[in-house]
Regions:
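Hydrophobic alpha-helical segments
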Residues: 1-183
Length: 183
């Protein structure tokens, strides 16, 4: 049970209700949005950013979901794994494959670029202060600087969402298949 109450669309100021409607096209994140709705600036800016990035993203959906699931596995966030593993399945990585992303080096469902995205997600999450230039040279071979910025931001933001969701004990919405992130 969530540690704070979950607000609904009707609890938002009228001006933010269209953003709630757009948010629901991103996925079944009503519990997360409902908690953020306690502070209109948090709801407004986080969901505006996510909706904008979804409509104008420059990272492939596959690479984005690889990054988000990897970070969520590392941080053991059941909420985020439950929401993003199905999106990764749409991109061709099985449920079993998603569960073992952190063991990426010999992962049969990942190509070399996929493995680089997972490796970078681990670096941003666990080794941000010890990451060397070598990985950036490999990233630059495949991604523009704008893409590297977006990928890095999405990885870091996912870590913040993992902590937010877990500390407030957000439950996975009804109808979303529950996935365990714990090893």
């Amino acid at each position: 049970m969530s540690r704070v109450s979950i607000k609904t669309r009707d609890d938002l100021p009228e001006a933010l209700r269209p953003l709630w409607d757009k948010m629901t096209t991103y996925g079944a994140f009503e519990n997360q949005a409902g908690v953020m709705a306690h502070r209109a600036p948090i709801f407004k800016h986080m969901w505006s950013l996510l909706v904008d990035l979804a409509s104008d993203g420059i990272i492939s959906k596959r690479h984005l979901e690889l990054a988000l699931v990897t970070v969520s596995l590392l941080n053991k966030c059941d909420y985020c794994v439950s929401h993003h593993a199905p999106k990764l399945a749409v991109q061709g990585v099985s449920e079993e494959g998603a569960a073992r992303l952190v063991d990426y080096k010999d992962h049969p469902e990942l190509d070399e670029l996929d493995k680089l995205v997972v490796e970078y997600s681990i670096a941003v999450t666990n080794n941000w202060n010890r990451t060397r230039d070598e990985i950036f040279a490999r990233l630059r071979a495949h991604f523009s600087e704008a893409q590297i910025v977006e990928l890095t931001w999405r990885i870091a933001l996912c870590g913040a969402f993992n902590r937010f969701n877990d500390i407030l004990q957000l439950e996975v919405e009804q109808g979303v298949p529950h996935s365990e992130a714990a090893e």
